[in-house]
Amino acid sequence: MAREFSLEKTRNIGIMAHIDAGKTTTTERILFYTGRIHKIGETHEGASQMDWMEQEQERGITITSAATTAQWKGYRVNIIDTPGHVDFTVEVERSLRVLDGAVAVLDAQSGVEPQTETVWRQATTYGVPRVVFVNKMDKIGADFLYSVGTLHERLAANAHPIQLPIGAEDTFEGIIDLIEMNALYYEDDLGNDPHIKEIPADLKDLADEYRGKLVEAVAELDEELMMKYLEGEEITKEELKAGIRKGTLNVEFYPVVCGTAFKNKGVQPMLDAVLDYLPAPTDVPAINGVLPDGEEAARHADDSEPFSSLAFKVMTDPYVGRLTFFRVYSGTLNSGSYVQNSTKGKRERVGRILQMHANHREEISIVYAGDIAAAVGLKDTTTGDTLCDEKEQIILESMEFPEPVIQVAIEPKSKADQDKMGQALAKLAEEDPTFRAETDQETGQTLISGMGELHLDILVDRMKREFRVEANVGDPQVSYRETFRKSAQVEGKFVRQSGGRGQYGHVWIEFGPNEEGKGFEFENAIVGGVVPREYIPAVQAGLEGALDNGVLAGYPLIDIKAKLYDGSYHDVDSNEMAFKVAASMALRNAAKKCDPVILEPMMAVEVVIPEEYLGDIMGNITSRRGRVDGMEARGNAQVVRAFVPLANMFGYATHLRSGTQGRGVYTMQFDHYEEVPKSIAEEIIKANGGNNKED
């Protein structure tokens, strides 16, 4: 099968935005106009083509980035729909990694919103060229020029309109094209056949002003155009388009278009802008990788180079099983052939290759450089792995994923759920690198951790729907520790002698605090054999075994020293078991003399917020028993660094989101253990029924 679309006529783009700016609706319209859908699905009716998980249709948000293929004016456009919720930033990161360009969708009433800032920063990190689509021009309060202003103020982006709206809110009827200098009016409801007319007289001055600004901005990026501009020569529309394309590809310029996807206006000109200004696979730099011998190498977008690709998403599909989405960077791949997973060192067979159209799929026999497709039949491949030619191996740069920040305990409701839960958690962890499931050695609970409360809610919900596993989700648990603050000499004596073979073990041990992080240290200071040498390891083992159960509330004892300096033994009745028990009794007796305390994990927290929220956020950190450790300005945001007890960080993501209208982001990781205030320690001991793990 010959290549249907040349590399130059291929576009891999993402649609990115704040939650509710209308990304999914925009993608829907693209699919409608490019002839892939015959009936338009509305998101708020829960019938959208891109949102194909039940939860997405219920909640009206996009969780998984579905990749879909469309055709427009002789070009192939592969579109990845990305989620706009903070908890799903990993989905955005992984889709940006395999895109060449993106359309940033703004809400005309709000302009740049918090999640837009986050996604925009991620796109800048990956050097992704962007076109901006100001959507919802029909909405009450829609203001195109205000929205363009927010691009400058909040993102410091060199963004300029290449269109202006004709009217706004319910009078929005078309757009002015600042390159062709004409007007497009939409007569019918589906926006299929816009009419080209003269620019209305009352908007002529505004159009001239913005055309002038556009020409000047483009000329600034290109010396030849600058010379023409300064000499007062006319810049042709071909030169203008070439200048915009060059600036956009270099991520120095962002063309802005407008419309309303919901009312079917302005979507086709936006698609034209995608073809005109966003890169083909041949316009982006070659991808770098490492060869088996450690040498660096590049792979270019070319069918004749060795096959190389990156798996960017794994999903379980109800019909075909496990689907691995991948982006081909070089070479070609036939279905039924073998490839090497060079990241894992495994050979994989590609059963079938599917080109995805939201939730319907088309089987193809070959994929070419620059394509995005899904493979069926890969067993060991996970997100971020490289798939390549067996003979010409290479490992491409992988993706980095953030560490999970929230953890909750989960338990199956019945025995039948127990077995299925393990499989379900393993499958979900395979699909999502920021989700972890593990068993807590101390409590025996299954703990799941992820990027936020919504993230975990949705995963538990998916267990129920897709894997039919019913589970109870507990409150998040904190792993406390215990230690000693004072030194003391303590006796431990275990004697049982009631006829026949008895038990006799007797030790004197000096306990005391050790340096933080040094753990448990045991010293043998016995002189003259008062405790025979063969029983010394038993004393140490007895202490180590008892440490796990603590002396106050059953939490492990850490950072203590124990020096065995005296004791006695019995020729017949002493044995290892007796000395083990004597040592653990000594440790328990130390609880009365060594001033034991409870320690809690302290998290290093970094909060990034717009300046106006600084006072509230600092106050909130203090109310959570946190200590502010430092502050700095980063761009137009403030960064607060603090240490906060983990026990007081639950629910923080939700608090921060509502307290800053979603504009604040935070990261936290474990830093050190610190003593719990007395009043809280008493509550913890009470909740655990004192040392509830005696004997």
Curated annotation (Swiss-Prot):
tr-type G domain ranges (all copies): 8-282
Single GO MF descriptor: GTP binding
GO cellular component, one term: cytoplasm
Lineage top rank: taxon: Bacteria
GO biological process terms on file: ribosome disassembly
SMART domains xrefs: EFG_C, EFG_IV
UniProt-listed InterPro entries: EFG_II, EFG_III, EFG_III/V, EFG_IV, EFG_V, EFG_V-like, EFTu-like_2, G_TR_CS
Primary location class: cytoplasm
SUPFAM superfamilies xrefs: EF-G C-terminal domain-like, P-loop containing nucleoside triphosphate hydrolases, Ribosomal protein S5 domain 2-like, Translation proteins
Gene3D superfamilies for the chain: 3.30.230.10, 3.30.70.240, Elongation Factor G (Translational Gtpase), domain 3, P-loop containing nucleotide triphosphate hydrolases, Translation factors
Pfam families for the chain: EFG_C (PF00679), EFG_III (PF14492), EFG_IV (PF03764), GTP_EFTU (PF00009), GTP_EFTU_D2 (PF03144)
Zinc is among the record's keywords: no
Subcellular location: Cytoplasm
Residue intervals passing through the bilayer: none
Record: residues binding GTP: 17-24, 81-85, 135-138
Keywords: Cytoplasm, Elongation factor, GTP-binding, Nucleotide-binding, Protein biosynthesis
Matches recorded under PANTHER family: RIBOSOME-RELEASING FACTOR 2, MITOCHONDRIAL, TRANSLATION ELONGATION FACTOR G-RELATED
Functional note: Catalyzes the GTP-dependent ribosomal translocation step during translation elongation. During this step, the ribosome changes from the pre-translocational (PRE) to the post-translocational (POST) state as the newly formed A-site-bound peptidyl-tRNA and P-site-bound deacylated tRNA move to the P and E sites, respectively. Catalyzes the coordinated movement of the two tRNA molecules, the mRNA and conformational changes in the ribosome.
Family, per entry: Belongs to the TRAFAC class translation factor GTPase superfamily. Classic translation factor GTPase family. EF-G/EF-2 subfamily.
HAMAP family documented for this protein: EF_G_EF_2_B
Record's protein name: Elongation factor G
Organism per entry: Listeria innocua serovar 6a (strain ATCC BAA-680 / CLIP 11262)
